[in-house]
Every structure is written in C-alpha cells, then in structure tokens.
C-alpha cells in the first residue's frame, strides 16, 4: 500500500514540473472558467446540480512532447453540499474555432449530504469541447469522472457533465 501512495505522490509532484518542457512567459494572462452542470448524472438517487469555477494561468503554459500543457486549479459545490477542490493539468488542442481539452486533476472531496465517494483524495479526469466566440470568450461542454482509484474501501465514482463559460 505504501508503494501505491509513493507513486501517486511522485506523479502529482513530477507531472507539472519543469522536466516536461520549457515555461512560456507572456503578459498577465489568466482564464476564469465558470460552469454549471449535473454531478453524478448516471446515479438517479445521488445526482445533483453543481456550480463551479476553474482558473488557468496562461503564463505557465508549457510546450512539451505531450503538446501545450497548462496548470489548472478549481472547485465545485453541489446542491447537496458536497465539495471538491483540485489542482492539475490540462492539454489544449487548437482546432481552429474549437478547442479539445482533456485534463487530469487530483483533489480533495467532502461529501456533505451528497454521495460518499469512499475517500477524501479523488482524481478528476475530464474532456471538454469549446467554441471560441471572441478572443476572450469560449462556450464549452465537458464531461468528467471523479474517482479515488481504489484508495478507499469503496470506489463508486461519479460521472458529471457541465456547461462552461
């Protein structure tokens, strides 16, 4: 079990490090993403409306062998007082007026009166498709899965979809 925690810790600290590429520093350019959606939509007994935010500092973008990688930080709350805060990385794939953005972010989950996900440490994997309306505005739809990777006694996971602005 200690080996599992060691490798998870190693992944969390090494993945966003300078080992993956050079830092691209530009103007003070930050993105704030606001989203609303349905948490755990695939479980009729536990689904709940969610509201969240995500911050991206484009000054910290890195061009790597994996493409353009950027750190992200965010969180959401559900109508059942569950909360999740996270920090991780996203990959931005430019497709003209559209962007395809997969991301991965470990975070801390508090169930409140919502779904018990089995552990405080949860991992969010997400895909997002955005349409660029102006230089500073995107509309997007995204899907994510939050899971504890079997760190806890149970690992039900939660599937969510969101609309992003």
What are the residue ranges of the model-derived segments?
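Cleavable N-terminal export/targeting peptides
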Residues: 1-27
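Outer-membrane beta-barrel architecture
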Residues: 35, 52-54, 88-90, 128, ...
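Gram-negative outer-membrane beta-barrel proteins
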Residues: 40-44, 59-61, 79-83, 108-114, ...
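Outer-membrane beta-barrel "beta-signal"
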Residues: 47-53, 156-165
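Residue-level signature of outer-membrane beta-barrel architecture
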Residues: 55-57, 91-93, 131, 145, ...
């Amino acid at each position: 079990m200690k080996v599992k925690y060691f490798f998870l810790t190693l992944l969390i600290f090494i993945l966003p490090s300078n080992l993956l590429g050079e830092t691209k520093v530009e103007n003070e350019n930050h993105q704030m993403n606001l989203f609303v959606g349905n948490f755990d939509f695939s479980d009729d007994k536990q689904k709940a409306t969610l509201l969240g935010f995500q911050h991206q500092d484009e000054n910290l973008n890195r061009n790597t062998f994996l493409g353009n990688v950027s750190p992200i930080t965010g969180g959401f709350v559900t109508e059942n007082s569950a909360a999740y805060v996270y920090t991780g990385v996203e990959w931005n794939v430019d497709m003209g007026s559209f962007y395809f953005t997969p991301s991965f972010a470990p975070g801390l989950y508090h169930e409140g009166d919502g779904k018990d996900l089995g552990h405080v440490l949860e991992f969010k994997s997400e895909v997002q498709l955005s349409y660029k309306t102006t230089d500073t505005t995107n509309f997007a739809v995204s899907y994510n899965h939050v899971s504890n990777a079997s760190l806890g006694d149970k690992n039900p996971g939660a599937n969510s979809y969101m609309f992003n602005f």
